[in-house]
Curated annotation (Swiss-Prot):
Biased composition (Low complexity): 507-526
The name this protein goes by in its record: Nuclear poly(A) polymerase 1
Organism whose genome encodes this protein: Arabidopsis thaliana
Knockout-associated phenotype: Lethal.
Key words of the record: ATP-binding, Magnesium, Metal-binding, mRNA processing, Nucleotide-binding, Nucleotidyltransferase, Nucleus, Transferase
E.C. code: 2.7.7.19
């Protein structure tokens, strides 16, 4: 492998952690990894690769014909008509070289000043494409944050963006990496160009492109298997994973992919968020475009997992991440680190790392969001809108109830027996380490109604677009969420996660004080009434009720919520810094209290194991300490839909490794104390918004049951 030190070049904003080269063991493990990635079908065939190149050539000729047509229609002189040109660029996974079979190709059409987006791109070009027999499934999205047209050309999926440059002629050798190309460009053009500029810059900033590609393929596959690959759901998308992998490649420039994967988990499991990830020092530029800078922009201080793009204007590519999704990803990084350490002693293999996360076994309680529409086209539009808003439900629950965590599933589910309908699910559980009280109530009616009001404010809403939100127990999950539509007869056994859960249960049940508390809670609960679970028996009444638009008689609904550790502990100042951020770091200290009607009783405190730390070498010089407080309200548009008033604390720029919670079971979802959340009888709202039918709202009541009752259905 070529060393980056052969020419004295340094990559990134800090010195590498290690310049060590590969060992024979690394070569073997990397070959095993590459074979595994091939066996699971992550590489396209040579025939498909050739077909993609042919399709891109056809698309380039289409846009060149289009630009000649509109130039002639607008009466340009003969010279400009002769030189009229448009050009196709690629970006995303295809440009990075990590796309798989059947993946979309992200493309950008760059056109001259006289070819407008509204009238020409979404006008004449859209008309031309619609009349071509080789073009199918044409879906223009002119109102998107980054306007695009999606379609298939000869069976290959294309996402086509448009950038209108203030040039009369687009040269065939146009270089998009020059900042001057952004001068006098409109905002939508800047955003459209950003994909290509960022992708190309990533490839320039990694020491070895082939090692980067193999590692990124691995991490993308791992993230999808573990359910943390989705920008819209609050996790990380393709560009985010690419930036994180590129940073690891910079820190270990001579390492093979097996080491890069291992160090990925080791570094980011210990990373002290919200310290930002940079591939290069941010360029403030000379064009006056806004860049990510928490020293200047107060709202940038609210980003909890900033991963900054390397091309001007630098932006936070991960502003969608929430407290809950960050907690989930940190748990997954910890799990990955443990498995990679086990692999070094041959106690685990790549199959172990890529075990899919059993989402529908991880929780006892879920929120089910059902949507439907009148026809396929309406459902496609409605689905896209609802997916973009689901993150708001997670944020609202986090904001209103600081002790509850939401885990959104990144994909939708289709019930084949119900056409024009799909469902989304969120796991619910309570933070560990938060004092809890029997009988404590959480009125989530307002939260659900706020979310539904936001969704129903869709500007393209038409009758037939419906949404309902309800609670469902694990034992009542519909069969269509399981592979093949068949509910498994038992939970997963023999996996890394299940073994960790078993170990954790054994350690939990050995605690005498906890057992005493449990007995008291169970005896008090058994007096509550015939609807209470006794000895693990199911309630006689239904425990999965959907909050639809149809008025129904009130029912009690039980929701079990495991308690888990708070992630908000202060970092350990004695541990070596691994921060490489060239900026100071910020986070919010805003607080939100639960809506409670009854005073808390029998507060149970759960102790945590003493923290451990796993230090690694410093990779940057700590910066000066700075403290600042702000009190402002910000409107975040698409990032946070409602105004928030926060008291923001500016953290020390010296990054330290956060405490390691030894209570983890190898999964971000510890199985400890189990709570029962019961929905109390509710009244119908006085007024209903669109849709016109009124909807019930749930009140959730918490009461504790057995600590050892963690696998009950």
């Amino acid at each position: 492998m070529a060393s980056v030190q052969q020419n004295g070049q340094r990559f990134g904003v800090s010195e590498p952690i290690s310049m060590g080269g590969p060992t024979e063991f690394d070569v073997i493990k990397t070959r095993e990894l590459e074979k595994h990635l091939q066996d699971v079908g992550l590489y396209e065939s040579k025939e498909e690769a050739v077909r993609r190149e042919e399709v891109l050539g056809i698309l380039d000729q289409i846009v060149k014909t289009w630009i000649k047509t509109i130039s002639r229609a607008k009466g340009l002189n003969d010279q400009l008509l002769h030189e009229a040109n448009a050009k196709i660029f690629t970006f995303g996974s295809y440009r990075l070289g990590v796309h798989g079979p059947g993946a979309d190709i992200d493309t950008l059409c760059v056109g001259p000043r006289h070819a407008t987006r509204e009238g020409d791109f979404f006008g004449e070009l859209q008309r031309m494409l619609s009349e071509m027999p080789e073009v199918t499934e044409l879906h223009p999205v002119p109102d998107a944050h980054v306007p695009l047209m999606g379609f298939k050309l000869n069976g290959v999926s294309i996402d086509l963006l448009y950038a209108q440059l203030p040039l009369w002629v687009i040269p065939e050798d146009l270089d998009l990496s020059q900042d001057s190309i952004l001068q006098n460009a409109d905002e939508q053009t800047v955003r459209s160009l950003n994909g290509c500029r960022v992708t190309d810059q990533i490839l320039r900033l990694v020491p070895n492109i082939q090692n980067f590609r193999t590692t990124l393929r691995c991490m993308r596959f791992w993230a999808k298997r573990r359910g943390v690959y989705s920008n819209v759901s609050g996790f990380l998308g393709g560009i985010n994973w690419a930036l994180l992998v590129a940073r690891i490649c910079q820190l270990y420039p001579n390492a093979l992919p097996n080491i890069l994967v291992s160090r990925f988990f080791r570094v980011f499991y210990q990373w002290n968020w919200p310290n930002a990830i940079f591939l290069c020092s941010p360029d403030e530029g000379s064009l006056g475009l806004q860049v990510w800078d928490p020293r200047i922009n107060p709202k940038d201080r609210l980003h909890i997992m900033p991963i900054i793009t390397p091309a001007y204007p630098c932006m936070n590519s991960s502003y969608n991440v929430s407290e809950s999704t960050l907690r989930i990803m940190k748990g997954e990084f910890q799990r990955g680190n443990e498995i990679c350490e086990a692999m070094e002693s041959n106690k685990a293999d790549w199959d172990t790392l890529f075990e899919p996360f059993a989402f529908f076994e991880a929780y006892k309680n879920y929120l089910q969001i059902d949507i439907s529409a009148a026809n396929v086209d309406d459902l496609r539009k409605w689905k896209g809108w609802v997916e973009s808003r689901l993150r708001q439900l997670t944020l609202k629950i986090e904001r209103h109830f600081k002790m509850l965590h939401c885990h959104p599933h990144p994909h939708d589910f289709q019930d084949t027996s119900r056409p024009l309908h799909c469902s989304y699910f969120m796991g619910l559980q309570r933070k560990q380490g938060v004092p809890a009280a029997e009988g404590e109530q959480f009125d989530i009616r307002r939260t659900v109604e706020e979310f539904k009001h936001t969704v129903n404010a869709y500007t393209l809403w038409i009758p037939g677009m419906e949404i309902s939100v309800g609670h469902i127990k694990r034992r009542s999950l519909p069969n269509f969420v399981f592979p093949g539509g068949v509910r498994p007869s038992h939970t997963s056994k023999g996996t890394w996660d299940s073994n960790r859960r078993s170990e954790h249960r054994n350690s939990s049940t050995s605690s005498a004080p906890a057992a005493t508390t449990t007995t008291t809670e169970m005896s008090s609960e058994s007096k509550a009434g015939s609807n209470s679970p006794v000895d693990g028996k199911k309630r006689k009444w239904g425990d999965s009720e959907t909050l639809t638009d149809q008025p129904r008689n009130s029912k009690h609904i039980a929701v079990s919520v495991p308690v888990e550790n708070c992630e908000g502990g202060s970092p350990n100042p004695s541990v070596g810094s691994i921060c490489s951020s060239p900026m100071k770091d910020y986070c919010t200290n805003g607080k939100s209290e639960p809506i409670s009607k009854d005073p808390p009783e029998n507060v149970v405190a759960f102790s945590k194991d003493p923290p451990e730390s796993l230090p690694i070498e410093k990779i940057a010089t700590p910066q000066a300490h700075e403290t600042e407080e702000l009190e402002e309200s910000f409107d975040f548009g698409n990032q946070v839909i409602e105004q928030i008033s926060h008291k923001v604390a500016v953290l020390s720029a010296t990054a330290t490794i956060p405490p390691f919670e030894a209570t983890s079971n190898g999964s971000p979802f510890p199985y400890e104390a189990v709570e029962e959340l019961e929905v109390l009888p509710t009244r119908q709202p006085d007024a209903a918004h669109r849709p016109s039918v009124q909807q019930r709202k749930p009140i959730i009541k918490l009461s504790f049951t057995s600590l050892g009752k963690t696998n009950g259905k």
